[in-house]
Amino acid sequence: MEGIAPRLSDFGIKEGTLVWDRGNTSQKTVTTLEKYGWELVCGVAKRSKEAIDIVSTTEVTSNLENHVSCGKKGHIYAVQKTAKLFGKERNVVVYLNLDKYTRCLAERNYKLNEISATLKNLQDNENGLSTESIRKMLGNVLKNHKKFFEIQWVEKQKPCFTWKINHEERILAENTAGKYLLYATNENLSAED
């Protein structure tokens, strides 16, 4: 995206507002476009520590004041705040898609309970299995949910591993589920805008 500002200038287009989804947003992109004087409205992916911190620590309540009208199909709530993003304090909007939040939470809880039952069963029935085969089985069971579990290996003891839910990761996932971050250079825009 940062290459677009010089190209637009080459065509004589010197000002305006660029709008894009969160996939192309980086500190370099934002600062370059701001340097060229462009207004921005963009999503910010939950990849950087700054973005994750903003989203996870911002409470977006589902009350009338935070409701964003988007027709009959969606339940969106948003709050505006000032937070450090891309190296400086900026006005940002955190919005909550209540339907997505509820679906993510239900699906994750179901999966974590399913994995927990499988781990318990594996512990109870590990006799005759080598540690290596148990490690392989655990890898297959945990897959994309590994960060939600803490596994400890115990030498010369049965069961040969212990496990527990990683509540810190679970809470972080819960606090970011269905929530998204938006940034606009125009500070006159409201959360609803």
Q: Residue ranges of each PLM-predicted region?
A:
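Anion-binding and metal-coordination hotspots
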Residues: 1-193
